[in-house]
Amino acid sequence: MSGPAAATAHDAPSSEGLEHVAGPLRAVAVATLSIACAALVALAAVEVWQVVARYVLDSPAAWTEPVALLLLKIVLMLGAAVGVRQETHFRFALGAAAAGRWQNALETFGRLATAAIGIVFAIWAASLTIATWELKTPGAPLPLGLSFAPFVVGGALIAVFAFERLRAGGRG
């Protein structure tokens, strides 16, 4: 096999090899992806109901928009975290193009930068979650702080999975 397909298949990152480094994190990644998939299905159902209620029943439901936005944040942040574990998200192609010790240094830098971004996400979102928890979400009986919670969880998971990759080094 030659051409772009061969290069893509050869260069595709994988989470294989990480189980011996952090076996429990594989279960966390599977659970995270399962929750993201369930949230995506729920998001689709809420959007369908939003359209049916508005255009078929002529009685729009106020709760659908804030719930859809919350589900979207869950899908995006949890999906991004799993993508970090598989190194298919926040991937730095420059590291793969570099030679020898520069490749390892750039991959290490990329993983550290990703972990730092995850930590900042988690801390910043935690402060927003706490600061806005007592406020109510317009249109839905939910605390406004709940809308920032996916960034707390997703940011923490991004950091954990980036550190897992850092510990694994070039393996996987």
Name what the model sees in each region:
Residues 1-172:
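Alpha-helical transmembrane segments and membrane-interface helix-loop junctions
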